A protein has these predicted regions:
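ATP/nucleoside-binding phosphotransfer catalytic cores, i.e., glycine-rich phosphate-binding loops
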Residues: 110-112, 117, 142, 152-177
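Catalytic core of DAGKc-family lipid kinases
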Residues: 2, 6-14, 18-121
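Short, solvent-exposed amphipathic alpha-helical segments in soluble enzyme
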Residues: 9-10, 78-79, 139-142, 166-170
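Glycine-rich phosphate/pyrophosphate-binding beta-alpha loops
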Residues: 66, 70, 124-138
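Short acidic/glycine-rich loop or secondary-structure boundary segments that cap or lie
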Residues: 70-73, 116-118, 131-134, 158-161
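Short, conserved beta-strand edge motifs with alternating hydrophobic and charged residues
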Residues: 107, 124-126, 149-153
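Gly/Ser/Thr-rich active-site loops/lids in small-molecule metabolic enzymes
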Residues: 81-89, 133, 139-159
Length: 177
C-alpha cells in the first residue's frame, strides 16, 4: 500500500485499500472494515477523502515511521511468528527486546525552529494511530489534520522498560514522564 500511495502523492487519484496484511493498522485508523467484502462495499459506497502523508529521507509513508524498542520488539515477534501463534510471538519479542535493546542517538530537526539531540528508547513520526496489529502508538493522530504527531521517549535504564509497556499498549505513552 505504501509504495502505491507514494506514486499517488500530489495527484487527485483515489486509492481504496482492501485489508490483506497481517496488522492492517492504517485500515483501523481510517475506519475501513477489516473483512475484505465489507471493505470493498465501504470503498464503493463512501466518498474518497484526502489523507496526510509523511516523508522521511525521500520516502513517503502513510501510517507511522519510527525506530527503537517498539520496532525491535516487532522484528523479534515477526521472527517468532514463523514458529508459534497467538500472543506468544509478541511476548517473546518484548522479552528479547528488553534483554537486547540499546538506546540510540537521535538528531531531530523540524524546520528551523526545533532541534533535538538525545538518546531515545522510541521515536515515532505518526500519521496513523496504530502499529504492530493495533498498538496505539499515537492515539491522538488524525490522518486528515495536516499534521504528523511526533513521539520521542527518552532512553531509560533496561529495568524500567517493563514499566513503560502498559502506557504503550493503552495509547498513553505520550503522557509518560
Amino acid at each position: 500500500v505504501c509504495e502505491t500511495a507514494a506514486g499517488l502523492v500530489h495527484t487527485n487519484t483515489s486509492l481504496g485499500i482492501v485489508p490483506a496484511g497481517t496488522g492492517n493498522d492504517f485500515i483501523k485508523t481510517i475506519g475501513t472494515p477489516r473483512q475484505w467484502k465489507e471493505a470493498l462495499d465501504f470503498i464503493l459506497t463512501h466518498p474518497a477523502r484526502p489523507v496526510n502523508t509523511g516523508e522521511v529521507n525521500d520516502r513517503f509513508f502513510m501510517n507511522v515511521c519510527g525506530g527503537g524498542f517498539d520496532v525491535l520488539t516487532l522484528t523479534y515477534a515477526l521472527e517468532a511468528k514463523k514458529h508459534v501463534k497467538g500472543i506468544w510471538p509478541y511476548l517473546y519479542g518484548v522479552l528479547r527486546a528488553i534483554r537486547t535493546f540499546k538506546p540510540f542517538r537521535m538528531h531531530i530537526q523540524v524546520g528551523d525552529d526545533l532541534t533535538m539531540d538525545k538518546d531515545c528508547m522510541i521515536c515515532s513520526i505518526a500519521n496513523g494511530r496504530y502499529i504492530g496489529g493495533g498498538i496505539p502508538i499515537a492515539s491522538m493522530a488524525d490522518v486528515e489534520d495536516g499534521l504528523l504527531d511526533v513521539l520521542v521517549v527518552d532512553a531509560v535504564p533496561r529495568w524500567k522498560i517493563p514499566f513503560y509497556l502498559p502506557s504503550l499498549m493503552s495509547g498513553t505513552l505520550y503522557k509518560k514522564k
